[in-house]
C-alpha cells in the first residue's frame, strides 16, 4: 500500500493537475487540500460501509462487579462485529446487543437471567446479569482508524503526515478521491464513480477469504461453546 502523497500524485495525474509537493502542510494549495479532504472522506465512507479485514480488531477486557464495564469499549471503536462476543471464563456466548426494551425488562424482572447479555449505550458497555469481577469477555470490532503512520506504530483517525499509509486498496482510494473531486468541481464524474463501485464490489468478494457453506445450513467448524438453552416451546406427548 502507498502513502497518501504517492496516491495524491497518481490522482493529480488522472485529473490533469499539477502534482502536489505535499498535502497536510500545504494549507494554501486548494488542489492539495481538496485531494486530502476527498481521500479522507473516501476512507471514512469505506469503513462505514463494510467490515474490511484490514480494520477488524479484537478487544478483550476483564469484568468488574457492576453492570457498566469500564473497559468494555476500546479506543477507536466504531462498531461491533455481530455474534462475536464470548465469555472466555465461562466458555459461553454473550448474547446481544439486546434491545433497549429487553434491557429494561431484565432490570424490572424479579428473576435473574442465567446467561450473559449486553447492551451498548452512551458509548459504554453494560452486562446483565451483573457479573462477578475477574471474568474475561472478548469480541471483534471495526476500528475508526483509517491509516497508520510511516513507522507502522501509530494509527490515525485522520491524516497528519504525508508519509502515512491508508488501510484501504490504493486503486480504490484513487478512484474514490477522483470522483469526489470531480463532483465538487462540478464536472462529470459518473464513469469514475461506476468504476469505483465495481472495484469496491470486487474487493469485497475477495476480502478476508470466504468459508465453505454446507447445503444443510450447518458448518464443519461448529465447535462454538454455546450454552444449553431451554426450548421456547415445550412439547408434551
What is each residue range found by the language model?
Residues 1-237:
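Glycine-enriched, solvent-exposed interface loops adjoining structured elements
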Amino acid at each position: 500500500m502507498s502513502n497518501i502523497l504517492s496516491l495524491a500524485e497518481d490522482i493529480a495525474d488522472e485529473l490533469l493537475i499539477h502534482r502536489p509537493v505535499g498535502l497536510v502542510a500545504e494549507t494554501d494549495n486548494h488542489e492539495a487540500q481538496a485531494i486530502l479532504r476527498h481521500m479522507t472522506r473516501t476512507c471514512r465512507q469505506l469503513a462505514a460501509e463494510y467490515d474490511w479485514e484490514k480494520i477488524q480488531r479484537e478487544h478483550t477486557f476483564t469484568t468488574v462487579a457492576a453492570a457498566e464495564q469500564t473497559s468494555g469499549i476500546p479506543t477507536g471503536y466504531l462498531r461491533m462485529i455481530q455474534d462475536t462476543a464470548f465469555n472466555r471464563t465461562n466458555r459461553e456466548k454473550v448474547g446481544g446487543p439486546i434491545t433497549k426494551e429487553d434491557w429494561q425488562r431484565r432490570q424490572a424482572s424479579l428473576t435473574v437471567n442465567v446467561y450473559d447479555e449486553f447492551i451498548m449505550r452512551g458509548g459504554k458497555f453494560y452486562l446483565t446479569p451483573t457479573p462477578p469481577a475477574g471474568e474475561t469477555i472478548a469480541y471483534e470490532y471495526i476500528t475508526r482508524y483509517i491509516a497508520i503512520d510511516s513507522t507502522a506504530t501509530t494509527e490515525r483517525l485522520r491524516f497528519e503526515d504525508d508519509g502515512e499509509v491508508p488501510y484501504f486498496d490504493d486503486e480504490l482510494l484513487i478512484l474514490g478521491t477522483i470522483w469526489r473531486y470531480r463532483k465538487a468541481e462540478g464536472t462529470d464524474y459518473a464513469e469514475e464513480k461506476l468504476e469505483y463501485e465495481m472495484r469496491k464490489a470486487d474487493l469485497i468478494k475477495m476480502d478476508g477469504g470466504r468459508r465453505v457453506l454446507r447445503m444443510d445450513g450447518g458448518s464443519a467448524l461448529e465447535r462454538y461453546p454455546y450454552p444449553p438453552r431451554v426450548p421456547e416451546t415445550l412439547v408434551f406427548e
